[in-house]
UniProtKB/Swiss-Prot annotation:
It comes from Rattus norvegicus. The keyword RNA-binding does not apply. One of its GO terms (cellular component) is TORC2 complex. Belongs to the PROTOR family. This is Proline-rich protein 5-like. It comes from the Eukaryota. GO terms for molecular function: ubiquitin protein ligase binding. Residues 327-370 are annotated as: Disordered. The gene is Prr5l. Associates with the mTORC2 complex that regulates cellular processes including survival and organization of the cytoskeleton. Regulates the activity of the mTORC2 complex in a substrate-specific manner preventing for instance the specific phosphorylation of PKCs and thereby controlling cell migration. Plays a role in the stimulation of ZFP36-mediated mRNA decay of several ZFP36-associated mRNAs, such as TNF-alpha and GM-CSF, in response to stress. Required for ZFP36 localization to cytoplasmic stress granule (SG) and P-body (PB) in response to stress. Interacts with the mammalian target of rapamycin complex 2 (mTORC2) which contains MTOR, MLST8, PRR5, RICTOR, MAPKAP1 and DEPTOR. Interacts with RFFL. Interacts (via C-terminus) with ZFP36 (via C-terminus); this interaction may accelerate ZFP36-mediated mRNA decay during stress. Interacts with RICTOR.
Length: 370
């Protein structure tokens, strides 16, 4: 038996060895040999990113100093930012702009304002704001056009920076109390525009300080705490005509009940959501940037207001006019005036016809001008 098995063993091992694959070599050896080439390519990419970012920094600081962009420079800056967005620095561009570039650029603006005192400082502030709002801000938006902010856009970040780093540091409130001259319209525009920018985390200390400034120059003023009064003479935006107009009192029971039943948070105007950047445009196409939703409109109130204003232009008497509007209760499911009215059954259609008929009768009987 031993003699019979002995010659079979070499044959069996020979068959197994024929199907065995050769042992693979150390796989990292080719990569180690190409490592210098990869390092050289990475260094070249970093140098390119640094060069692109340096060009962006130089252009932004030059804009804050009052300079402009050269021919075709905007296209080159946009391409540089697109390359940076694809690199490791892409997620830090917005933060670096807010914390470094914007702070450094606005420091030049603050120094220019603080060189003057008294009423001259207010005049310089108005000039600085005009240049910032008409020249600097649009240029910054154009340079950082490819950037899509996470919560705030480049425009909002720039306006918030101007509020915190320029306006609140020049102590405009003290200047307004001491100033006897007429306040420039650019300062009022600046305060109202800055008030329209809101932080995503809610009202900050800077926003509340800004509201105190707005309260000193605008009357009537409606802020987070409601209507406020001020002892200092204020500038009313609606006071444009010096001629005497008759007083008109509008009594609308539906609006009164709606106002009383609505909480304070819903009565305060909420800001529009502003989006910009290439990513947003690719997502939404040609959709408008600002959208006003749930805008309630009353056709009857609009018609009566038109008649009221047309009567004011013809009559110059000082007698009081009282306008009584009938109560209108819109259905709870109607959110917009353009929303179609869909009824489920003929009975509801009959009820609506009866309600509209009674409403027309009440309009003819209750609406009167005395």
């Amino acid at each position: 038996m031993t003699r019979g098995l002995a010659p079979l063993l070499p044959i069996e091992f020979h068959k197994m060895g024929s199907f065995r694959r050769p042992r693979p070599r150390f796989m990292s050896s080719p990569l180690l040999s190409e490592l210098p080439r990869f390092q050289a390519a990475r260094q070249a990419l970093q140098l390119s990113s640094n060069s692109a970012w340096n060009s962006v920094q130089t252009a932004v600081i030059n804009v804050f100093k009052g300079g402009g962009l050269q021919s075709n420079e905007l296209y080159a800056l946009n391409e540089s930012i697109r390359r940076l967005l694809k690199s490791e620095l892409g997620s830090f561009i917005t933060d670096y702009f807010q914390n470094q570039l914007l702070a450094k650029g606005l420091s030049f603006v603050e120094e220019k304002i603080k060189q003057c005192e008294g009423d001259n400082r207010i005049e310089v502030l108005a000039e600085v704001w005009d240049h910032f709002f008409t020249e600097t801000l649009p240029t910054l938006q154009a340079i950082f056009y490819p950037v899509q902010g996470q919560e705030l856009t480049i425009r909002q970040i720039s306006l918030l920076g101007f509020r915190d780093l320029v306006l609140l540091k020049v102590k405009l409130g003290d200047l307004l109390l001491l100033s006897q001259s007429k306040l420039p319209s650019s300062v009022i525009q600046m305060l109202l525009i800055l008030q329209s920018v809101h932080e995503p985390t809610g009202p900050s200390e800077g926003y509340l300080q800004l509201e105190e400034l707005v309260k000193q120059v605008v009357s009537p003023f409606l802020g987070l705490s409601g209507d406020r009064s001020c002892s200092r003479p204020t500038h009313s935006l609606a006071r444009r005509h010096s001629r005497v107009r008759p007083k008109v009192t509008v009594l609308n029971y539906a609006s009164l009940m709606t106002t009383v039943g609505r909480p304070l948070n819903e009565m305060v105007l909420t800001p529009l959501t502003e989006q910009e950047g290439e990513a947003y445009l690719e997502k939404c196409g040609s959709v408008r940037r600002h959208t006003v939703a749930n805008a309630h409109s009353d056709i009857q109130l609009l018609a009566m207001a038109t008649m009221m204003h047309s009567g004011l232009g013809e009559e110059s008497g000082s007698e009081d006019k009282h306008l009584l509007l009938p109560p209108t209760f819109p259905p709870p499911h109607r959110q917009c005036s353009s929303e179609p009215s869909i009824l489920d059954s003929p009975d509801e259609m009959e009820l609506e016809d009866v309600a509209s008929g009674s409403q027309e009768d009440s309009e003819l009987n209750c609406a009167s001008l005395s």
